[in-house]
């Protein structure tokens, strides 16, 4: 298990709160992706892929067909950038 701390952008936290009230199944999937990403940020479930161009430095994992978990990671933090919609 990683010692990375979890951080959220304001927009990502709003996305997360949306899922809490609208779709518990999607919320469970997001939580599962976050847990996996904390320990293995660049491989595993959700088909992790590095983003390009203006999103260079961020990574993405599939929540479902329409939504993505977008995040940045370093040695200390996993920062959730978005968890709703497709970048």
Task: Locate predicted features.
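Enriched for short, Lys/Arg-rich terminal
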Residues: 1-5, 11-28, 45, 51-52, ...
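Residues that form generic nucleotide/phosphate-binding pockets
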Residues: 15, 33-36, 54
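Compact soluble domain cores
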Residues: 27-40, 45
